[in-house]
Amino acid sequence: DNADFRWGICLALNIDEISMNTFSGAGRAAPIPLMNNTQFLQETYTIPMQDWLENFELDLGDGTTFKPYDTGYAKRMADSLGIEGTDEELITMFGAGWWKHDEEAATKLLEKAGLEKVNGVWNYEGKPFTFEMSYLADTEFQEARGVQAAYNQLTKFGFQCSIASKSSATWDVDGGKGNYQIAGYWPSGGILKDFYSAISGFDGDLIKPLGETGSGQGLRWNNEKVTEILHELANTDPESDR
């Protein structure tokens, strides 16, 4: 549970290549990975957050900071696919932004998290740092291709990781209990105006320890402010403008 490690992994990945491998470039990037990035969700939340996202900074641990948000993704994908359009049209097609691919920043963050690259291999406490990446074997085939592309990139970047496919039944158990390390699967709920049911699992009062079936979100991300908001939403009329 280390934010520097997670950001290091994120910045080590090249979303352009992953998108080409997953959707042949036709996917809409979702910088806030809670739900599927529908046009409604993007226009209601992501686009109004652009200033905040563009000014968001990471502490690299060496006295410098880094702004990880990348607004150039839509234009790059359009250029690579030979698609023309206004900025607004390209954002509708490809998304408002994603996170930068920057191996130098990724390296600093991983070192800040306690890892060290030895002879091209990432080590932790003197041993190669290993983890498993998993995806669903019998459904969500685009997501499987995305995980496979990410696995190839992280292996090239120096991680001795493994990759595994799981049945939906196995993932239902493992996801609920937190029995995974890095996993790829589709979120849902972004098409709904009232998506409380899709995010209610982030209520800190419902989160269970690892090994116990959790509240509906395998991340076990616990934030006091979010819990307060969810408690308020639980008692808000779905037809309310709020």
Q: What are these language model-derived features?
A:
Residues G25-A26, N36, N179-Y180, A198-F202:
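Short secondary-structure boundary/capping segments
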Residues D1-A3, A29, G126, K177-G178, ...:
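Short, solvent-exposed loop/turn segments at the edges of secondary structure
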Residues N2-N152:
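Append "and occasionally in soluble cytosolic enzymes with long acidic Gly/Pro-rich linkers
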Residues Q181-W186:
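Paired acidic/hydrophobic, glycine-rich loop segments that form the ligand-binding mouth/hinge
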Residues R6, S19-T22, F56-T92, W99, ...:
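Extracytoplasmic/peripheral linker and loop segments enriched in polar/acidic and small residues
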Residues G189-D194:
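A ligand-binding cleft/hinge motif common to bilobed small-molecule-binding domains
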Residues A3-D4, Q148-F157, A169-Y180:
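Short helices/loops that flank or line small-molecule/ion binding pockets
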